[in-house]
């Protein structure tokens, strides 16, 4: 299925220029959007298979990439394993960005009580592909602290590390999360009246 051995990789580089962590994107963007817009990331890349956490001076960072954002169990696993921050560098298309970018990032921050750092590609690219932009920083309560909007730019925000514990104390969803058996469709459907 995966024709090439390249990976879509995110790197964490320390202040001395050394690579301290690398994450290979797990979920490939193989989609058919409206008006014939279609993408097959698996034609160029093979998926990674391992979630990555790295200790930083400020807390634990969970690393992901782009389309991974649509798989909440990945982020729950990172948070349960100790992530305080989630890095999600992305190249969302304009249609998917307009519809889903802000809400998905805010949801991942809220449901896991984490800060979200989401640098985002913006602009027009080969074959008419357009990316949404809007690099964001979101706090654990879901408040957008910084939004680059459209265009080239850098976002920064002053963050309060106590916000992580506060959000998790007020809504302790990480503690309340319980394993469950995936449902099966009932053998006999209900009769319609």
Write out the residue ranges for each language-model feature.
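Short helix-loop capping/hinge motifs at secondary-structure junctions, enriched
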Residues: 18-21, 143-145, 164-166
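CN hydrolase (nitrilase-like) catalytic-core segments centered on the catalytic cysteine
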Residues: 60, 66-155
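A conserved C-terminal secondary-structure "cap"
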Residues: 164-193
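Active-site catalytic loop in hydrolytic enzyme cores
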Residues: 4-81, 94-103, 170-173
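Active-site loops and adjacent core secondary-structure elements that bind or stabilize anionic groups
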Residues: 1
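Short beta-strand-to-turn element immediately C-terminal to the catalytic PLP-Schiff-base lysine
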Residues: 12-14, 138-139, 157-158
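Active-site/binding-pocket entry motifs
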Residues: 28-29, 93, 123, 163
